[in-house]
UniProtKB/Swiss-Prot annotation:
Biological source species: Cyanothece sp. (strain PCC 7425 / ATCC 29141)
Subcellular localization: Cytoplasm
UniProt catalytic activity: 7-phospho-2-dehydro-3-deoxy-D-arabino-heptonate = 3-dehydroquinate + phosphate
Residues annotated to bind NAD(+): 110-114, 134-135, 147, 156, 174-177
Top-level taxonomy: Bacteria, Bacillati, Cyanobacteriota, Cyanophyceae, Gomontiellales
Its job: Catalyzes the conversion of 3-deoxy-D-arabino-heptulosonate 7-phosphate (DAHP) to dehydroquinate (DHQ).
SUPFAM superfamilies: Dehydroquinate synthase-like
Protein name (Swiss-Prot/TrEMBL): 3-dehydroquinate synthase
InterPro entries from the UniProt entry: Dehydroquinate_synthase, DHQ_synth_AroB, DHQ_synth_fam, DHQS/DOIS_N, DHQS_C
Amino acid sequence: MEKVIPVHLPHQSYAVVIASGGLGQMGDYLQHQAHLKPGQKVLVVSNPLIFKHYGEKVLVSLQRAGFATSTCLLPAGERYKTLKSVQQIYDCALEQRLERSSTILALGGGVIGDMAGFAAATWLRGINVVQVPTTLLAMVDAAIGGKTGVNHPQGKNLIGAFHQPRLVLIDPDTLKTLPGREFRAALAEVIKYGVIWDGNLFQKLEAAERLDQYRTLSPQLLADLLVHSCQAKVDVVTKDEKEAGLRAILNYGHTIGHGIESLTNYRKFNHGEAVGLGMVAVGQLAVDLGFWSQEECDRQFSLIQKAHLPTHIPADLDLNLLIDSLQTDKKVQAGQVRFIVPTAIGAVTITDQIPTPAIVHVLKQMQKG
């Protein structure tokens, strides 16, 4: 399959290309979709495991097309998403004498994409970045839209920049080597798109016999899942590139989810699992406060269960610290925490009128499981 989704922005337009076998044609895509020229330098940023699977295929294709290649390998995992890791990319960029016309190619999941994108945004005040996501989570979320950054000890993604890629190349074949837990976690973001934007996608997920493993998805469902999710992200980003308003809806489930991630030191739950927990919490909050029906909330809960995602939080998680952590969320305005709240399957609203006692009540219920 090959599907090209155009992203039209005021200052830079690009394509999201979904292509089976695309990694082996990387050089061609850089020339014809990213409009880069042979002879230019490309620094491939990855982690050792991903590079072991796909690095040679990418390098051979780039070299065959005439690009001057080099590599920078970083440790894998959210806890390495730091300025220290970005410094390693800077060191590689300096060693390879990257120029304004050079490109950083992010080959990996969301952590690699965020760090490589931030390095590209800040090296020489901005050079090209090409996003080549190899995880489902990065394919449907992190690689599209130009958000880049790293974590601060006090919160997730507090240091960053908007820096749009020259190209996003998604090769679904890389999902064959994705661990099952990572695949399931990414489904939280896919379900999110169904709740906030695309009711048709939500219904397709409901109709699927199983969602918990890559190999149980039909090729058609996988294609639908990728295309619908990417199109939803592109639709929102096109309307609001810098998160001035509408784009904030993409953070559904993230406000509480980021707090859970941070307070469990990014070790107990991965990002998608934490987002799923945030969706469970806000979904029930939306019922309690009259935003949507219990039936719609139950449909969301059932899909999250169908993806074999966690639905309860640890009994020993300090809820006072979790409530405090919400104040460091990027969506806080004038000291008020803004929540993305569902009003129907396929529609949400943004509100800062969520009483803290209501949040605590829902979280306590989630601890009882």
